[in-house]
Regions:
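Duplex nucleic acid-engaging cores and interfaces of nucleic-acid transaction enzymes
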Residues: 45, 49-50, 54-59, 83, ...
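Residue-level detector of conserved catalytic or cofactor/ligand-binding positions
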Residues: 231-240
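Charged boundary/loop elements
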Residues: 1, 60-73
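Conserved polymerase palm-domain catalytic core
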Residues: 19-27, 31-32, 69-73, 78-81, ...
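Acidic, glycine-rich two-metal-ion catalytic cores of nucleic acid-processing enzymes
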Residues: 18, 24, 28, 41, ...
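Surface-exposed loop/turn segments and immediately adjacent short secondary-structure elements
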Residues: 1-20
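Active/ligand-binding-proximal structured segments within catalytic/core domains
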Residues: 54-62, 165-169
């Protein structure tokens, strides 16, 4: 950090450009921190300062492209959103929408089990078609972890772009849940009446998602709807890993 502090802006830009011409990230430092309310440790992967600069550059390019395509009720690691907004949405669904049943989902070991190939395809699917950039992201995902070797899956917590990548992975799940009811649009919808009819007389599941990182809730009006969502999620979430 002290070395970078002595660099001029031009020197930093030239260095980062030189790194990107044939990018090879340095090994990530493994740090274990305590999990709140648990005896277990949370593994973090801390990149070197120059790799953090590269990740910040990538974040500033990707975030404006991805943000409009993320679901409106995903609140974790996003600009101008917080846990307070997620809580407000939950309160609104309970008090105004009468959604009293909750499917509470926390994906165990999510960050450590992200499928690299699927993630890169999802980035492509969001309209990011710069193969050179995708290649650099692939190299970041494969950064060696000191004392552990090269990972075959997962995105290390501690990286600057890891939160954005996690939202990209879970964006498909957000929209799948939402399309079951909240954003469902029947093909022949000609009026609001038809839209309401289609909701009532189909096998759609009545539920609304509220997600913060890998922890999300689906609010439902009945126990039966919550049970249907729960069983469907067990099946649909497997390809995410």
């Amino acid at each position: 950090i002290e070395d970078i502090g002595r660099c001029s802006d031009k020197e930093m830009i030239d260095t980062v450009r030189g790194m990107l011409s044939d990018y090879k990230p340095k090994a990530v430092r493994r740090v274990l921190i305590p999990k709140p309310g648990s005896d277990k440790k949370r593994p973090l992967g801390i990149p070197c300062i120059w790799d953090r600069l590269v990740q910040q550059c990538i974040l500033q390019v990707l975030e404006p492209i991805c943000e409009p395509k993320f679901h409106n009720h995903s609140y974790g690691f996003r600009p101008n959103r917080s846990a307070h907004h997620a809580l407000s949405r939950m309160v609104s669904l309970i008090n105004l929408g009468r959604h009293y049943y909750c499917v509470d989902v926390d994906i165990k070991g999510f960050f450590d089990n992200v499928n690299h190939g699927k993630l890169l395809k999802q980035i492509w699917g969001l309209g990011i078609r710069d193969k050179r950039l995708i290649s650099i992201i692939g190299k970041l995902l494969k950064s060696e972890i000191q004392g552990e070797g090269i990972p075959t899956k997962g995105t290390p917590q501690g990286g600057i772009i890891s939160p954005l990548l996690s939202n990209i992975v879970l964006n498909e799940l957000d929209w799948w849940v939402s399309d079951q009811w909240e954003t469902y649009k029947p093909r022949r919808a000609k009026s609001e009446t038809f839209h309401n009819y289609a909701h009532q007389y189909t096998n759609l599941k009545d539920g609304y998602i509220v997600r913060y990182a890998d922890d999300f809730k689906i609010m439902c009006r009945t126990y039966a709807e919550a049970q249907r969502f729960y069983l469907s999620l067990i099946h649909i979430s497997e390809p995410t890993r």
